[in-house]
């Protein structure tokens, strides 16, 4: 069916892990002639990213997890107020359907939609269902998951399970295109490592990588690094590289504007295990050493990589295990036998769903066709 003149609301916010998958879907919906409006919170990451691409409306919203007792007491009142405001906004926008990608802003918008009989699709990017989506699952028309969730039958009712679909994480087209590229690892003596510290940086990773380059060089492993530090650690990390030859450095930057180019360049990635990074590495066929964020809610980053690790397509080190010795124990055999990297690349591509965006689009069309 055509989505022409259909008003679809995208709501996502807080982190890139929520925002970038939502952007991929929003773009596909626009290509299918839908009218797309984004709803986010002011003074947020989405407020700085989304306006370049889509019309964005703002509501105030905040979470309750790990907050003080006063905020926990007042939270229900704020949620009720924000939900009421969201109902007015959805009526004003003449919304036909709402898609929530998580973050606190999704709560009141999706609740409001359900209250006024607007269909709701929610998408969970992680291998552990977040608090907002656990609540919204009761009201959603369709529940989309990126990963198989352990013991899902204990978390969802039979009714919720019946409307649940595993679709993967939406990834930008230029990264999906890398899935068709066969990675060749035997034509260079240099091992190219892409280091991703995340948008806020990863201090522990940023500190150890320069030491890893030096130690590897001493052991005859020729590494070249492209290091994304995050905005908070750029100068400090650059200083740690000052005694390392430029021959071992591709670039050190707070951000990488074109991740497809970076993924295409790399042989191996060292990174956190956020859902989007995990999905992008797998779809691009990139072996990775994942270092889950220790403070991640419900340890979700650890669970995000279990399918990849179990299929021998990547490695997972807890942060306390991220020593020079353990990193070298992984890197040295891969450098000596590049066919291992090639095999991991092939396995990585098989671990995640390639056409996630199209599957979510299909959910949208089915719901609106039956509306």
UniProtKB/Swiss-Prot annotation:
Subcellular location: Cell inner membrane
EC top class named in words: transferase
Protein residues bound to UDP-N-acetyl-alpha-D-glucosamine: 15-17, 126, 172, 199, 256, 275-280, 301
Membrane-topology annotation of the record: Peripheral membrane protein
Pathway: Cell wall biogenesis; peptidoglycan biosynthesis
UniProt-listed Enzyme Commission number(s): 2.4.1.227
Chief place of localization: membrane
InterPro entries, per database record: GlcNAc_MurG (IPR006009), Glyco_trans_28_C (IPR007235), GlycoTrans_28_N (IPR004276)
Protein family: Belongs to the glycosyltransferase 28 family. MurG subfamily.
PANTHER family, per database record: GLYCOSYLTRANSFERASE (PTHR21015:SF22), UDP-N-ACETYLGLUCOSAMINE--N-ACETYLMURAMYL-(PENTAPEPTIDE) PYROPHOSPHORYL-UNDECAPRENOL N-ACETYLGLUCOSAMINE TRANSFERASE 1 (PTHR21015)
Protein name: UDP-N-acetylglucosamine--N-acetylmuramyl-(pentapeptide) pyrophosphoryl-undecaprenol N-acetylglucosamine transferase
Organism: Francisella tularensis subsp. mediasiatica (strain FSC147)
